[in-house]
Amino acid sequence: MNKEKEIESFRSFEHVWIDMPDGVRLAARIWLPSNALTKPAPAVFEYIPYRKVDMVRARDERNHPYLAENGIVAVRVDMRGSGDSEGLMSDMYCEEEIDDARQVIKWLTCQPWCNGKIGMFGISWGGTASLQANVNAPDALKAIIAVCATHDRYEDDIHHMGGCLLTDSVEWGATLPAILGAPPSANIEENWFEIWKARLDKLSFPLETWLRNEDRGSYWRHGSVIHQSDEMRAPILCVGGWSDRYSNSVMSLVDRRPDLAWGIVGPWGHHYPDHAHPGPGVGFQKLMLEWWQHWLIKDNPLELEWPKLRTWVRSYDSPADAINIRSGSWVQTPASKEITFMTKWHLSKGGLNKDASEIHLNLPSNLKAGTKGADTGYFGRFGGLPPDQSNDDRASLCFDTKPLEKDCLIYGAARLELSLKSSDHRNQLCLRLNDVAPDGTSVRITWAIRNLALDDNLETPDQPFPLGDLKIRVQFPSMAYRIKAGHILRLAVSQSYWPMVWVPPSIGVITLLRGVLTLPEPHYELESLKVNLPKVEDLPLEKSYTVSTEAQLERYPEKFENGEIRSGWYQPYSSVYFNEIDTYFGYETCAEFRIRPNETLTACCCYEHSMTFIRPDGTAVVTCMVQLKCNNDKYLLLGTFKASWDNQIVKTHKWNLNITRKYT
C-alpha cells in the first residue's frame, strides 16, 4: 500500500495492487477502519472503469469514507484496462471482467483486515457488474446494491430498445474510448507514459460490435441476469430513478425474486439518489449503511424488515428542461405483480374506450415525431427532460380517453397488443403514453419502440413475417404514475422517433387494425411510507475537491438549413479540482443530428466527447468523435480518436467501417 492518509476513524490508501491469476494487476483505493487490523471487518467494493484517481473521485469521497467511518472496509477498484489498472478492455461485460470481479472477492477475503464477509455495489456499469457477480455468487458475497443498473443488456441498456438502435449507443461509442484512452496516473510506475502508449496502441472501438449485433442473440444475453435470475444467490437492493430508463430493472427483479430483492425507485435520473435531479433525493449513504449493517455485521441475519418496494408515485408536472422537485409521493408495497389487476382500454376511432372495435387507421408517414423526446432516452441529464409532447402528438396517431372521472394509478409495466398490416418488414412503431392536462399540455409518462422485423422476444424469426396481418405485443417500461381526475390518458403511435431512435430504411404504410392497451392498477390505495427514507446529507463534511462548473445542458433549437432539419445539444465544460492530488479533471460533450424531411437514408448523428486532465506533471487531453450514417443495407460508421500530452499528439486512431444492416 502507498500514499497512506490517516484520520481518527480510518486510514486511506491511494493506490493498492490486486493480483489477477494471469499476472495482470488491478488498481484499488482503500479506506480502512482504524481498528481493522486488530478487529477484522467486512469489506464492500465498487468495481467500475471510471478512474479512481480523478474521474469519479468526488463521488467516491461521498460514499467510501462514510463506510470506513462506520466500521466497514471500503474499496474502489478500476476494471482491467481502465484508470490505473493494467491489461486491456476489449468490450463491456466480457467474461474476463466478470472473472476479475470474483478474483477481487477472493483477494478481499484473504486480507488480514477482512473478516471474510463481502458486499458489492455500484451505479450503472458498477451496479450491473454487481448483479453479474451475484449469479452463482461465491459464499463470501453476502449482499449487493445495484443502482441504475440493467438486468437486460439488449432491451434496457443504452444500445437498443424494442429491437431498434438507439442513438444513445453512438454517444456511448464516442465516450467509452475516451475513458479507456485516458492516461494512468503516476501512482503506478515511473514508466506510466510507456504503459499509456501501449494501451493506446490497442485501444478498442466497441461500437462496431454493438452495431453488428442487431437482435437479442448470444452477445446481448451474456451478462443479462434477467436470463439467470434463478441463479442469483445474495440479497439485492435495487435502486433506480424514473427519469432514467435503467429503472426498469427494479420492479422486474423484485417481481422475479421477491425472496431476494428489495427495490427503491425515486424521481431522479442516472445518479446516486443523494445527488437527485429531479428530486426529492434520498440519503444514500445512510441507506446503504443500514443495508450493510444488516447483511454484513449481524452474525445470522434474518429477513430484512423493509418494504419490498418503495417508489415515488409521480403525478403531473408542467414540462420543463429541468425540474428541481417532482410532484408525487412515496409509497411502500409488496412486489407490484402481487397487488395489481389489469385494466383494458381498446383502441377505437373515437380514442381509448372499454369496447373492442375495428379501427383500420393508417399511421402518419413522416419523420416529425421525436423532436420533443428529450436530450437522451436514458440518463435524464440535468436540463434534458422531455418537453411538451404536443408537437410530437400532432405528428402521430393518437388515442385518448375521455377526461378521467377519478384518478388512475398505473403501477408496473403496461402492455399493448396490436394487429396491423405493414408494407415493409423493417418498419418500426413508437408508442408513447402521455398525461394530457385540461389546458392541452402533454407530458410523456413513458414510451416504447418496436422493430417489426423481430419477433416478440426480439429475436430474428426463422422466416420473415408475412406482410399481411401481423400481431405484436409490446411491454412498456415499469412505472408508478398517477393521472389525475380531469386529465386524459393518451396513447400516441408513430413510425419513427428521430433523433432518439435510428430511423428505418424507409417510411412505409402501417395500418392499425385492432389494439388493446392493458394497464396495471393496484387493488387498493397504496400505503404511504411508515418510515421515511434517510434525508440527503452534504457529504463529505470536509471536501478535498472544488467543483468549478456544473452547467445545465443546452439544447440547440431545431433549424432547417441546406435542405436538412438540424438539432442537437451541448453539455458545457464541467470541471473539478482535487487539492489532495493537485489535479483538474474536466469534460464536455456535444451532439448533432441531421436529416432531410422524410428521407430516412439521409439520417446522420455525430457526437464528440472530450476529457482534460491537468496534473502536476503535465496536461492530457483525449477526444473521440463518432459519426453514423446509413444506406439501405449498411451502417456507415466513422470514428476518430486523439490523445495528447502537453499539446503534443501521443496517438490518433481512425475507424471507417461499413457494417451490415439487416433488421434495424
Regions found by a protein language model. Give the residues of each.
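Conserved alpha/beta-hydrolase "acid-adjacent" motif
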Residues: 245-250
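Glycine-rich nucleophile elbow surrounding the catalytic serine of serine-hydrolase chemistry
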Residues: 122-132
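Short beta-strand/loop motif that positions the catalytic acidic residue
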Residues: 232, 238-240
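Alpha/beta-hydrolase fold nucleophile elbow
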Residues: 112-124
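Cap/lid segment of the alpha/beta-hydrolase catalytic domain
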Residues: 35-110, 158-159, 437-438, 498
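Accessory cap/linker subdomain of secreted extracellular hydrolases
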Residues: 60-61, 69, 132-231
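C-terminal, loop-rich substrate-recognition/catalytic regions characterized by aromatic stacking residues
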Residues: 278-643, 648-664
